[in-house]
């Protein structure tokens, strides 16, 4: 494999091309991209954890340093002002020298408010991309050039097409997340609490809670029915029945987002359902290819859900087609089949149909689907089907003409297990699909 430095060099070439195109389209001279700033907790002097501007880390793998600035014009070497204060209260990151610094001009910025004296005097035609509009106004950036929608839409649209450098980073993030999942399963099997399982995961991935790309979902038993459960009980339940782990990792700013579900016992109805969801997930991925709408795969999986509901006698005396048509699969899988993945976990532009930002909403029947794009090579997406037993979604079906088709006794027996989700991260290629997760032998 090419070195990361060589891949990064080509990555910058691609970003420079996109920059030239977007500047010409919107008649701008350059983009000033701000890493962001620290924001204090209300009525306190402690800041919230820093989260870098994703458009900034698209260019440079600097994810922990606020008050940095990047000036790009698509022609000259990108110029990075790296915040380097004299500060004995806090850790100060040294001026970077790494695989990427040959491609970027790196200059120390000793004072956060010193950027004004470093920029070109004429700034009326510079676009600001960042989270602090008032800072841009102070720098005499025109209000119309602060996060201009057309520029943002263009940049977001092309972020769907990962460079080889980005794919290499995402494969590294996968390795870290897979290590975490293996450690977490072992912790679950040894009877640990959600809190302690989370610690085992973080230790294995080398992350702290503020480093992971999203809050880990560490859900034992019925907690697996809460789609974004992040509470972390300190006490292990008296009986371990099930474990759903939705947790990722980050490498050079790029995310992994994996989910696995385990049954404490290997021979009960729940364990068999977990195996079948896993098998159907793999079967769907095997059918994926460029040129097909992501929506189609979501709809196809509802047909697979119907097959499982029928096989496991959760829904009875109804055809699979009728289940999907009447949305009886909906309460069992209330979320989308997945989402774009990259610099952000729910990566941008999932609904954009072109680089002008044309929006295609999710089908009204499936409003929580996060992507309606036609799959193309270099796109990275999650495939994360699930089956859950969520009372608030099942309750409306307890009355009415379809109630008789629900095997309520079976559902009540499965509710203490919460639910099931299996999630892999896949890359679309010209001639097939790369499953980054399964390539690392994560069962």
UniProtKB/Swiss-Prot annotation:
Please give the GO cellular component terms listed in this UniProt entry.
cytosol
Q: Which SUPFAM superfamilies match?
A: Creatinase/aminopeptidase
Q: Which GO terms describe its biological process?
A: proteolysis
How the cofactor is bound: the record states:
Binds 2 manganese ions per subunit.
The alphabetized UniProt keywords are:
Dipeptidase, Hydrolase, Manganese, Metal-binding, Metalloprotease, Protease
Q: What is its EC number?
A: 3.4.13.9
InterPro entries given for it?
Creatin/AminoP/Spt16_N, Creatinase/aminopeptidase-like, PepQ_N, Pept_M24, Peptidase_M24B_aminopep-P_CS, X-Pro_dipept-like, X_Pro_dipept
Cofactor(s) required for function per UniProt: Mn(2+)
Give start-end of the signal peptide. Answer: none
Substrates-to-products reaction catalysed: Xaa-L-Pro dipeptide + H2O = an L-alpha-amino acid + L-proline
Q: Where is Mn(2+) 2 annotated to bind? A: 246, 257, 423
Which family does the record assign? Belongs to the peptidase M24B family. Bacterial-type prolidase subfamily.
* Name of the protein: Xaa-Pro dipeptidase
Where does this protein come from, organism-wise? Answer: Salmonella typhimurium (strain LT2 / SGSC1412 / ATCC 700720)
């Amino acid at each position: 494999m090419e070195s990361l430095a060589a891949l990064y060099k080509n990555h910058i070439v691609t970003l420079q091309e996109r920059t030239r195109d977007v500047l010409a389209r919107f008649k701008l001279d350059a983009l000033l991209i701000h890493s962001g700033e620290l924001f204090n907790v209300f009525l306190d002097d402690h800041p919230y954890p820093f989260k870098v501007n994703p458009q900034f880390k698209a260019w440079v793998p600097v994810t922990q340093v606020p008050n940095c600035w990047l000036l790009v014009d698509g022609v000259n070497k990108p110029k990075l002002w790296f915040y380097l204060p004299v500060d004995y209260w806090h850790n100060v990151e040294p001026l970077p020298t790494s695989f990427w610094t040959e491609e970027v001009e790196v200059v120390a910025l000793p004072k956060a408010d010193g950027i004004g004296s470093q920029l070109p005097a004429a700034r009326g035609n510079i676009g600001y991309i960042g989270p602090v509009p008032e800072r841009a106004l102070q720098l005499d950036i025109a209000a119309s050039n602060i996060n201009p929608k057309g520029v943002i839409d263009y940049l977001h649209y092309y972020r769907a097409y990962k460079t080889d450098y980005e794919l290499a980073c995402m494969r590294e993030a996968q390795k870290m997340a897979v290590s975490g999942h293996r450690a977490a399963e072992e912790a679950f099997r040894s009877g640990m609490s959600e809190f302690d399982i989370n610690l085992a995961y973080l230790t294995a991935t080398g992350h702290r809670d503020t480093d992971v790309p999203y809050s880990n979902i560490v859900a034992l038993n019925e907690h697996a029915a809460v789609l974004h459960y992040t509470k972390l009980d300190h006490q292990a339940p008296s009986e371990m029945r099930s474990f759903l782990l939705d947790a990722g990792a980050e490498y050079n700013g790029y995310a992994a987002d994996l989910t696995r579900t385990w049954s404490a016992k290997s021979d009960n109805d729940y364990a068999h359902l977990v195996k079948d969801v896993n098998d159907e997930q793999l079967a769907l991925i095997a059918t994926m290819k460029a040129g097909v709408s992501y929506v189609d795969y979501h709809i196809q999986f509802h047909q697979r859900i119907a097959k499982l509901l029928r096989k496991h006698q959760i829904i009875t005396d109804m055809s699979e087609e009728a289940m999907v048509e009447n949305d009886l699969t909906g309460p069992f899988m209330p979320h989308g089949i997945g989402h774009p993945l990259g610099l952000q976990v729910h990566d941008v532009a999932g609904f954009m149909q072109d680089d002008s930002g044309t929006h295609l909403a999710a089908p009204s029947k499936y409003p929580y689907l996060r992507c309606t794009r036609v799959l193309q090579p270099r796109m990275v997406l999650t495939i994360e089907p699930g089956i859950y037993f969520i009372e608030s979604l099942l309750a409306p079906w307890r009355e009415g003409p379809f109630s008789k088709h629900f095997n309520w006794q079976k559902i009540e027996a499965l509710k203490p297990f919460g639910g099931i989700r299996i999630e892999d991260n896949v890359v679309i290629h010209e001639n097939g699909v790369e499953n980054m997760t399964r390539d690392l032998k994560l069962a």
